[in-house]
Amino acid sequence: MTKPAVVLIGGDKGGVGKTTVARTLLDYFAHQQLRVRAFDTEVPRGTLKRFHPDVTDVVDINHVPDQMRIFDTVNSTDATVTLIDVRAGLLSPTLHALRNIGFIEAAKKGDITFVLFHILGPSIASLDEIVDTAAYLGDAKYFMVKNFINNTYFFEWDEATTAAYFKRIPGAVGITIPKLVEMAAEQVDLASVPFATFIANKKQSGASASYSFVLRGYVRHWLDTIWAEYDRVGLTDIIEARESPRPPIGRPRPIIKIAET
């Protein structure tokens, strides 16, 4: 039986493209035919919900009833994947809350697959975020994402820097999100549809649209590049991990040898 998976997308800095990454993931999971539900913590407007209204609910991640709404239903929902788009500044508090409620421990025991996409900013301060995040991870699958939004220039990590920070998370894997042509990004934003829907020249309702052939081509190439990154790191295999068979409860029953006749 496939374990429920929780995918967290966050970063403590704003303007690093967390929701853009979340949108590419929702399209990717749909393409892989994985049932997914999403929670948008950008209260009250809900940016992710604007693009994926059918699978997304807006919640206040600091509000205990909303935490219950997400995590109490992880095992009972029909969705294989629960995706959470964490608003800027709330990644560390959210991880702290997950540790306090026992979620991190449940992931460590193998009851839940926990995946974290940590969207890094371009400054050296992001390295401190990595250190802070490492304290909460447990056995989570940790992806460090460089999102080249707005021609962002990322600092280069030399060997000493890598040794000092990255060794704290031995299983960390890097993912690169390229920049989408600005006009294409603007048109998808104006259309308020998923990237895959824009590529298919459809409106949110499913009706045919008249988006630019050129811009759809740019979005298709960009999204294919990102999906290739997700394939490279084996994201689908991670999400579809199965529960380990549990040992029998109690002592094994004795084997009774039947006498030969």
Predicted features and spans:
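Catalytic cores of phosphodiester-bond-cleaving enzymes
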Residues: 1, 125, 137, 210, ...
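Nucleotide-state-sensitive switch-loop elements of NTP-binding domains
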Residues: 2-8, 22, 31-97, 101
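Short glycine-rich or small-residue beta-strand-to-loop segments that form or flank ligand, phosphate
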Residues: 7-10, 116-117
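Walker A (P-loop) phosphate-binding loop of P-loop NTPases
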Residues: 14-15
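Conserved lysine of the Walker
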Residues: 18
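Conserved catalytic-core segment of NTP-binding enzymes
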Residues: 89-189
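C-terminal accessory "lid"/substrate-recognition subdomains
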Residues: 143-261
